[in-house]
């Protein structure tokens, strides 16, 4: 069976791959989750009948965690804060100076609505947009305020952080039960491992 691989390098001054188990004191995973990587791919190209399934991610800079604070003024503040129009201060532990190489494969979600090969069409659309620096929406490294300083083809001087070996006891994999138009059904992977700087995503 023919495969339709894609790949992308992303980098930025900050990233937040939020661990749900850290509650209100948000803390980042060391690498993007499956769903975060899928969202990055979809920021560049998407179809209703096909999607890009993340396969693995390579960590390309040393892990640096940093304390971060921001003022939240959205609708989820407490009633007394809303009443006096007060901000809620969010404290988080984020990653700084990050770089990743993400690999994926175009997969079918539903039968193609047209006679053309929609898997090849999505692959070509993705590769064309990456080469031209075009995207569907602004790429973010987790939180929307953490935009990229670079996204595009692999750069020759980027190196995998091969000294990095660690285990994440429980890591969010996906949020929905289907790759497209799914219902909320979070899935976690136990004992996810980053080995020689590489995190392979579960099927």
Regions found by a protein language model. Give the residues of each.
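Glycine/small-residue-rich interface belts in oligomeric ring/scaffold proteins
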Residues: 22, 27-70
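N-terminal, Lys/Arg- and Ser/Thr-rich interaction peptides
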Residues: 1-24, 190-199
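Residue-level signal for secondary-structure boundary sites
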Residues: 16-18, 65, 110-112
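Short, hydrophobic/aromatic beta-strand segments
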Residues: 19, 51-53, 113-115
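Extracellular structured ligand-interaction cores
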Residues: 5, 54, 97-101
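Internal, well-folded beta-alpha domain core
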Residues: 72-74, 79-203
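Short, surface-exposed loop/turn motifs at beta-strand boundaries within globular domains
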Residues: 1-3, 34, 95
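Beta-strand elements of well-folded, non-transmembrane domains
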Residues: 10-14, 61, 102-110
